[in-house]
Curated annotation (Swiss-Prot):
E.C. no: 6.3.4.4
Organism per entry: Rhizobium johnstonii (strain DSM 114642 / LMG 32736 / 3841)
Chain positions recorded as Mg(2+) binding sites: 13, 40
GO cellular component labels: cytoplasm
Catalysed reaction equations from the record: IMP + L-aspartate + GTP = N(6)-(1,2-dicarboxyethyl)-AMP + GDP + phosphate + 2 H(+)
Molecular functions per Gene Ontology: adenylosuccinate synthase activity; GTP binding; magnesium ion binding
Name this polypeptide is given: Adenylosuccinate synthetase
Length: 432
């Protein structure tokens, strides 16, 4: 038995929600370790859809413990609203099935406002990143700047006032520079005191809780949000998120040691998508790109934004295999490729007349690369709902084998529809 870390191996939206839900049935604890409420996913259980963006997937399953780790930035209002939506669907959320790290950073209204002001200013100058305007980046900035308000601070109103003073010294200086009205001390105090009683019951010393559970032999599933190529260090900077999304963050963002992480499962879509700005070497701006977007329902859960679509990029996924230490992948949305006469896979790039096997880190070089493709024959038969290799067309199996060979990692799971049980299990990550 081992613990499992789930990471996205592309730009997010790889189908992590379904795979995490599939695995969470067998886990005891599901841990979120980075990001905020900027990356959503939909779980379908017994025909009911649950939309989550901050809460770990385990929260909708009876008998499971969901944990929000210290690496997550928590918007208390978004948290309360999400709990309310789940309770309206009959899901009970109490400290018996949800714990939040007492040292997790809080997202405040001033973070959301700063995020939006920056994006508006950047839109006018052509340097827009394409954030969700939810305050994620500014909250992480305050965390690194050592001025953040954390969950534990809600329990100590006597010292909270001084911490609010410190954060406002920074933010009001920024607001004056942007020509925006300053935020009052009382407004932030009111904002925090209004949510304290709803948030504090869930707080815990998460590293200690997880260590005790590990020693008891509990199965722990670490749930990543977004994807490797949005990692602040290893992604397509500056068009990235504000946290580390690679598997190593599961340790830092939860308080578990790296030796406890176990199997690293990379969720990998059978084609490529991206939301927002930034380089995308295999992007298809033609009828095939439209086909993938329509058939794959490529619209963001949180923002509703249309995703950009393109061919599978083996060179990028190879990089993700390396930077995460991925043990095996879960290949998702194979069924979206049904009916295409031919399929292409990017195996490398041409850059200024030279062939390279990885995407360079330089923004300028990323914009100049041209993908090198191999072409495979497609298949006409449907793969929707396949639950064994015998259910798959020969060409679909050939495509999967080609992907494995090109990325240098085996397929552990193969997903053939949004339904949880439409999954071909090759290797059980929990038993590896």
């Amino acid at each position: 038995m081992t613990n499992v870390v789930v990471v996205g191996s592309q730009w997010g939206d790889e189908g992590k929600g379904k795979i995490v839900d599939w695995l969470s049935e067998r886990a005891d604890i599901v841990v979120r370790y980075q990001g905020g409420h900027n990356a959503g996913h939909t779980l379908v259980i017994d025909g009911t859809s649950y939309k989550l963006s901050l809460l770990p997937s385990g929260v909708v399953r009876p008998g499971k413990m969901a944990v929000i780790g210290n690496g997550v930035v928590v918007d208390p209002h978004a948290l309360i609203a999400e709990i309310g939506r789940l309770e309206a669907q009959g899901v009970t959320v109490t400290p018996d099935n949800l714990r939040i790290a007492d040292n997790a950073t809080l997202i405040l209204s001033l973070h959301r406002e700063l995020d939006a002001m920056r994006e508006d200013a950047a839109s006018n100058s052509g340097t827009k990143i394409g954030t969700t305007r939810r305050g994620i980046g500014p909250a992480y900035e305050d965390k690194v700047g050592r001025r953040a308000i954390r969950v534990m601070d809600l329990a100590d109103l006597d010292s909270l006032s001084g911490k609010v003073d410190r954060i406002l010294t920074h933010h009001n200086a920024l607001r004056r520079g942007l020509g925006v009205a300053e935020v009052s001390h009382q407004a932030i105090m009111d904002e925090l005191t209004s949510v304290a009683d709803r948030v504090l019951p869930f707080r815990d010393t998460v590293w200690l809780f997880l260590d005790k559970e590990r020693r008891k032999g509990s199965r722990i599933l670490f749930e990543g949000a977004q994807g490797t190529l949005l990692d602040i260090d290893h992604g397509t900077y500056p068009f990235v998120t504000s946290s580390n999304t690679v598997a190593g963050q599961a340790a830092a963002g939860s308080g578990m040691g790296p030796g406890s992480l176990g199997y690293i499962l990379g969720i990998t879509k059978a084609y490529t998508t991206r939301v927002g700005e930034g380089p995308f070497p295999t992007e298809l701006k033609d009828a095939i790109g439209e086909f993938l977007g329509e058939k794959g329902h490529e619209f963001g859960v949180v923002t509703g934004r249309k995703r950009r679509c393109g061919w599978f990029d083996a060179a990028l996924v190879r990089q993700s295999i390396a930077t995460n230490g991925i043990t095996g992948i879960a290949l998702t949305k194979l069924d979206v490729l049904d009916g295409l006469e031919e399929l292409k896979i990017c195996v490398g790039y041409m850059l200024d007349g030279e062939q390279i096997d990885h995407l360079p880190a330089s923004q300028g070089a990323q914009a100049r690369v041209e993908p090198i493709y191999i072409t495979l024959e497609g298949w006409k038969e449907s793969t929707v709902g396949a639950r064994s290799w015998a259910d798959l067309p020969a060409q679909a199996i050939k495509y999967v084998r080609q992907v494995e060979e090109l990325i240098g990692a085996p397929v552990a799971l193969l997903s053939t529809s949004p339904e949880r049980d439409d999954t071909i299990l090759v290797t059980d990550p929990f038993e590896d």
